[in-house]
A protein has these predicted regions:
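A short beta-loop-alpha structural element at the N-terminal edge
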Residues: 1-4, 49-50, 108-121
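Conserved GNAT acetyl-CoA-binding A-motif
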Residues: 62-72, 201-213
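Conserved acetyl-CoA-binding loop-helix of GNAT-fold acetyltransferases
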Residues: 51-56, 180, 186-199, 203
Length: 240
């Protein structure tokens, strides 16, 4: 199951890269390279060959690849002199057959359908996570709702939260970018968004829901019935 969870994320990034024409891929790794956005600008799906990571780091330091790498733990990047860990996430999964959502849909949750919606999602996500999300990318990727759906939480004309569900080729639904802005925290918005995404996953007849949780978020998702598996780590590669 751990690999299926990772594959959902990698497949989502690959899907984005193809939609925006920025996917780099070969037998050893994949990358989405964008200048105008921090998301999903990175290298991923790296093969386990002995010298692959060193080659990728050389390409990054030569400005030929994005300087962010996401890999499963354990990884030799932990001890590499030119890498700096800045994000750890727990891989989690939930069998949707065990899930019944009792609460009603929250009317404040709106699906992204227009360019304006996409720009508002990007601004909300940027405020929630502290890195730049480009609305043009969101709009291009949101066009096929059978593959991916973007949502915002709008209350009293203020955008307070966001979330994404991505349906992969293994019939798993990945929950991504569930976040709240500083003004939206402590109001249960993340829980409401998670419930909405779970409903969409069940409506899609997905087998499992998968996600990648921070240390703070892991216990929240366990309350929904998610089980923890392995870990992902994201590193920034430093210049020489």
């Amino acid at each position: 199951m751990n690999q299926e969870i990772i594959n959902n994320l990698y497949e989502f990034w690959e899907y984005i890269g193809k939609k925006i024409g920025r996917l780099v891929e070969n037998d050893h790794y994949k990358a989405v390279s964008v200048v105008e956005s921090d998301w999903p600008n990175r290298v991923f799906s790296i093969s386990t060959g002995k010298d692959i990571l060193s080659e990728i780091i050389d390409l990054i330091q030569g400005k030929l690849l994005p300087n962010i790498i996401t890999v499963p733990k354990p990884t030799s990047l932990e001890s590499h002199s030119h890498s700096k860990l800045f994000l750890k996430q727990r891989n989690m999964a939930l069998n949707l057959k065990t899930v019944e959502i009792q609460s009603k849909n929250d009317e404040n949750i709106k699906q992204v359908r227009t360019k304006e919606d996409a720009l508002n999602f990007a601004k909300t996500a940027s405020d929630a996570f502290g890195y730049k999300v480009d609305g043009n990318i969101v709009y291009l990727v949101s066009e096929d709702t059978s593959k991916v759906q973007f949502f915002t939480y709008l209350q009293n004309n203020e955008y307070l939260g966001c979330g994404i569900v991505f349906f992969d080729s293994n019939n798993n639904a990945g929950l991504h970018m569930i976040g709240t802005t500083p003004n939206g925290r402590g109001k249960g918005i993340g829980t409401k968004m998670t419930e909405k995404l779970l409903r969409e996953a069940k409506a899609n007849k997905s087998e499992n829901c998968v996600l990648h949780a921070s240390a703070m978020g892991e216990n929240i998702y366990k309350k929904f019935g998610f089980n923890s598996f392995g870990e992902l780590e994201t590193y920034r590669i430093l210049e020489k």
